[in-house]
């Protein structure tokens, strides 16, 4: 008798995706972050669902409803902090996942890579609208500043901003629609994740050597299910330590002050995972230029498959590109640090240099390094 998981229409899909999937035998722990992102998404949807049961999306009661969740709802404080810190874990995994893709040349799988960029942008949008919901000072002013950037779009900008706000300022209409967006977007993300996996399983996974691994594949279960489970345990441990011991370490103290349109915080800044893009935005004096740089800072990822001219797959055997890669990572950390600093010398200057370097490494230096490495290969 044939095994049910191989014949049943529904189980067959699960079987081909998570059980009998042929997987390269040498993929390292850097390949764990895809499953960890799936885990993060599940945690966020579940905790978010329970928070939505008690939250009210009205300017008069939003802030106090979050306080009510923390004080009066059974384990509400835990659900709230798991959700807030779960977002941080989500973005840590996301950055590592994208960084792995760049390092090992996974961007040659263009469909998977491009849907990944769409996922990244959708996740950023979800996190942004979610940050507005507690209706604290930083929620309100963050929403005001970031949505206002759309006014830089020529001709239709001002109308567009007023249309997104649902009025002439960030108010009740804005909060209500942001809650609606924040509720629906994770399910859209989940749908995109399935498309992401569909495209990935068309070609199979990449591997650290950058060589074709068709001659050496092993089943996903039990080898990688157990490996992913270890990753999940470690992720949950870090998340629990964050949520239970340091719940506010990644948050902003200003968000414990209810939103007040008449009082601007000293330093308006987004959550830590947006700081690199915020630093790039601020480093350009022109408003429209800043907005374009902000958008390009993410969309530049789509250039990787186009700019790739290397004869080798991934950076494993490419020392020059490796050096550039780690400079790029360090530069990204510098941008993250600058994003949280006040707009004054020397921070502005450092931010401008880092922003230029961010784009230069990807668009100019890495392709040049590839050409040099190709030339070196020909010598031997």
Swiss-Prot record:
Function: Component of the ubiquinol-cytochrome c reductase complex (complex III or cytochrome b-c1 complex) that is part of the mitochondrial respiratory chain. The b-c1 complex mediates electron transfer from ubiquinol to cytochrome c. Contributes to the generation of a proton gradient across the mitochondrial membrane that is then used for ATP synthesis.
Originating organism: Delomys sublineatus
Pfam families: Cytochrom_B_C, Cytochrome_B
Leftover remarks: Heme 1 (or BL or b562) is low-potential and absorbs at about 562 nm, and heme 2 (or BH or b566) is high-potential and absorbs at about 566 nm.
InterPro entries: Cyt_b/b6_C, Cyt_b/b6_C_sf, Cyt_b/b6_N, Cytb/b6-like_sf, Cytochrome_b, Cytochrome_b_C_euk/bac, Cytochrome_b_N_euk/bac, Di-haem_cyt_TM
Protein encoded by which gene: MT-CYB
Keywords: Electron transport, Heme, Iron, Membrane, Metal-binding, Mitochondrion, Mitochondrion inner membrane, Respiratory chain, Transmembrane, Transmembrane helix, Transport, Ubiquinone
Name of this protein: Cytochrome b
PROSITE patterns xrefs: CYTB_CTER, CYTB_NTER
Location(s) in or outside the cell: Mitochondrion inner membrane
């Amino acid at each position: 008798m044939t095994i049910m998981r191989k014949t049943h229409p529904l189980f067959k899909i699960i079987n081909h995706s998570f059980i009998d999937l042929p997987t390269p035998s040498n993929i390292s722990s850097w390949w764990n972050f895809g499953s960890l992102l799936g885990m993060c998404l599940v945690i966020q949807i579940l905790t978010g669902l329970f928070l939505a049961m008690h939250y009210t999306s009205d300017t008069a009661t939003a802030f106090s409803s979050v306080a009510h969740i923390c004080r009066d709802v059974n384990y509400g404080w835990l659900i709230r902090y798991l959700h807030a810190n779960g977002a941080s874990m989500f973005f840590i995994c996301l950055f590592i996942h994208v960084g792995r893709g760049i390092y090992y040349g996974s961007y040659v799988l263009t469909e998977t890579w491009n849907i990944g960029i769409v996922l990244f942008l959708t996740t950023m949008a979800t996190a942004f609208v979610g940050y507005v919901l507690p209706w604290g000072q930083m929620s309100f002013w963050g929403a005001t500043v970031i949505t206002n950037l759309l006014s830089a779009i020529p001709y239709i900008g001002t109308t567009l901003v007023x249309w997104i706000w649902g009025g002439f300022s960030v108010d009740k209409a804005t909060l209500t629609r942001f809650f609606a967006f924040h509720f629906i977007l994770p399910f859209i993300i989940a749908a995109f994740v399935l498309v992401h996996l569909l495209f990935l399983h068309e070609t199979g996974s990449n591997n650290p050597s950058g060589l074709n691994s068709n001659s050496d594949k092993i089943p996903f279960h039990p080898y990688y299910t157990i490996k992913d489970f270890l990753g999940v345990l470690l992720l949950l441990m870090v998340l629990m330590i964050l949520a239970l011991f340091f719940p506010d370490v990644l948050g902003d103290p200003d968000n414990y002050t209810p939103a007040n349109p008449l009082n601007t915080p000293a330093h308006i800044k987004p959550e830590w995972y947006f700081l690199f893009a915020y630093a790039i935005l601020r480093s350009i004096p022109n408003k429209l230029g800043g907005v374009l740089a902000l958008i390009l800072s993410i969309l530049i990822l789509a250039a990787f498959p186009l700019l790739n001219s290397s004869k080798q797959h991934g950076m494993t055997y490419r020392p020059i590109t490796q050096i550039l890669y780690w400079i790029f990572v360090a530069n990204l950390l510098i941008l993250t640090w600058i994003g949280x600093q006040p707009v004054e010398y020397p921070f502005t200057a450092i931010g401008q240099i880092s922003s230029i370097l961010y784009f230069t490494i990807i668009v100019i230096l890495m392709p040049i390094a590839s050409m040099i490495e190709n030339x070196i290969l020909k010598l031997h």
